[in-house]
C-alpha cells in the first residue's frame, strides 16, 4: 500500500486518470488556502458548441463545473476523515457521485481559457452541496452553478 498525498493524488486522479477529464483538457487542479477547488480548461475547436461564433459548448461549461464541484466534495470528505493510503482514498472517492446540479449560463463562453472554482456550502455525512463559478480569461463570470454530491 502506498501513502496517500492529498493534493498530489487528487491532481493525478483529476487530470490523468479520469478519461472524460482528459477530453475536457482539465489542467491546473489546485485547492486554495481557503479551501476553494480550482481547475482550468483551454478553448479548443473540439469544445466549441456554436461553430459560427466559436463559443464554448454549454455542456463543457456544465461538465467543468461538475468536476470542480466534485473536487470540492472530495476535499470535504478527506477533511473529515483523511485516508491513509491510496487504496483507501480510492474507495472513498469511488463513492462520490453527482446527484443534482443546476447551472445558470450568464453569457457565452468566449476566451482562450476558463477557470472553474467550487466551494462547499454544506458538508454532511451523506451529502455535500457546492457552489461553483466559471470565469473566462478576462475574469468575466460566464456561468454559476450549485452541485449536490452523494459522499457516503
Language model features: what each stretch is:
Residues 1-152:
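Terminal targeting signals and extreme-terminal segments of soluble enzymes
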